[in-house]
From Swiss-Prot:
Pfam families: NAD_kinase, NAD_kinase_C. Belongs to the NAD kinase family. It comes from Thermoplasma volcanium (strain ATCC 51530 / DSM 4299 / JCM 9571 / NBRC 15438 / GSS1). GO terms for biological process: NAD metabolic process; NADP biosynthetic process. The active site is at D62. This is NAD kinase. PANTHER family: NAD KINASE.
Length: 272
C-alpha cells in the first residue's frame, strides 16, 4: 500500500496529525510526503503534481482536497482541520478510529463527476467543484451569453456565472442560490452571482450537456476560476466551454450512504 500525505501550507498542527497516523499504519506501507509535509516530517518531499498513491491523505480543508484533485493521482481521504469541510471525510477526533478502519480495509472509494473546461478551444485543468466566470474588478457588472448544447439560453447581466457539479453544488453555487444536487444526480447547475434581474433563476442541465459562456459587449474583461485554485484572464469575445470530464474525482469514504454526508456536512449546520 502506498500512502501519500498532503497538508495545508504552514500548518504545524496538520503535520502533528500526519505523524499520529504514520505511527499507526503498518511499517511496510510506503509513505510519500508533499513538500509541505516534508518540512515537518523529514525526508524528501514531492511536488504535488508528482504524487501518485493508493490513498492520498489530505490534512487541512476543502482547499487542500481540491488542490490534490487538480494535481495529484489517487483517491483522497480528507481530514477536516476547521470549517465546514464538505469534501473532507473525518474530523480530528475520528483520526485514530478511521486509521484503523483504513488498515483493515473497511472503506469504499466513491467517484464523483469532474468538469473539463476550455477557453476558445484550449483545454485547461479539470475541476471538481465549479468553474466560475467572474468580473475582473469589484462592482463592475458584466454581460454574459449562455448556450447549452449550442442552443441559446439567456443573456445575463451579473457579477459572474457559476457552473457546478453535484459535488460543487453545496459550495459557491449554493451561496449564489443554486440547489443542492446529490452525487448520484447526473447534472450540472448554472447559477449567477448578483444578477441584475431577480427573475433569473439557476438552471440544472444534464451532465452530458455542454455549457458555453460567451463574454459579450466591449471592455468586458473577466476571470475564469477553477475550484478556487487556478485563475485565467478572459476578454470580450472569448468563449468558455464546460462539460463533463472523462476523469473522475475519487474519495475514500467510511460512511454508509450519501445521505450521511449530506446530513453531517450540510443539513446539520443549516439547522443549528
Amino acid at each position: 500500500m502506498k500512502v501519500a500525505f498532503v497538508i495545508r501550507k504552514d500548518c504545524k498542527r496538520c503535520a502533528t496529525i500526519a505523524k499520529s497516523i504514520i505511527e499507526l499504519i503498518p511499517p511496510d506501507w510506503e509513505k510519500i510526503y508533499d513538500t509541505e509535509a516534508a518540512k515537518f516530517l523529514g525526508g524528501v518531499g514531492k511536488d504535488i503534481t508528482e504524487i501518485s498513491a493508493d490513498i492520498i491523505i489530505a490534512i487541512g480543508g476543502d482547499g487542500t482536497v481540491l488542490r490534490i484533485l487538480q494535481n495529484a493521482k489517487g483517491p483522497v481521504l480528507g481530514i477536516n482541520m476547521g470549517g465546514l469541510g464538505f469534501l473532507t471525510e473525518i474530523e480530528i477526533d475520528e483520526v485514530g478510529s478511521s486509521t484503523y478502519k483504513l488498515i483493515r480495509g473497511e472503506y469504499k472509494i466513491n467517484e464523483a463527476m469532474k468538469l473539463k473546461v476550455y477557453i476558445n478551444g484550449r483545454r485547461l485543468e479539470d475541476c471538481t467543484n465549479e468553474a466560475v466566470v467572474h468580473t475582473d474588478r469589484i462592482a463592475r457588472i458584466r454581460q454574459f451569453k449562455i448556450y447549452v448544447d449550442g442552443h441559446f439560453l439567456t443573456t445575463i447581466k451579473s457579477d459572474g456565472v457559476i457552473v457546478a457539479t453535484p459535488t460543487g453544488s453545496s459550495s459557491y453555487s449554493s451561496s449564489a442560490g443554486g440547489p443542492l444536487l446529490l452525487p448520484t444526480v447526473r447534472g450540472m447547475v448554472i447559477s449567477y452571482l448578483a444578477p441584475y434581474s431577480s427573475r433569473i433563476k439557476p438552471v440544472v442541465v444534464p451532465s452530458e450537456s455542454t455549457v458555453e459562456i460567451k463574454i459579450a459587449g466591449n471592455d468586458q474583461d473577466s476571470l475564469l476560476i477553477l475550484d478556487g485554485q487556478k485563475e485565467y484572464k478572459i476578454k470580450s469575445g472569448d468563449t468558455v466551454s464546460i462539460s463533463m470530464s472523462e476523469e473522475k474525482a475519487r474519495f475514500v469514504s467510511f460512511r454508509e450512504s450519501i445521505y450521511d454526508r449530506l446530513r453531517d456536512k450540510v443539513i446539520k449546520h443549516v439547522v443549528n
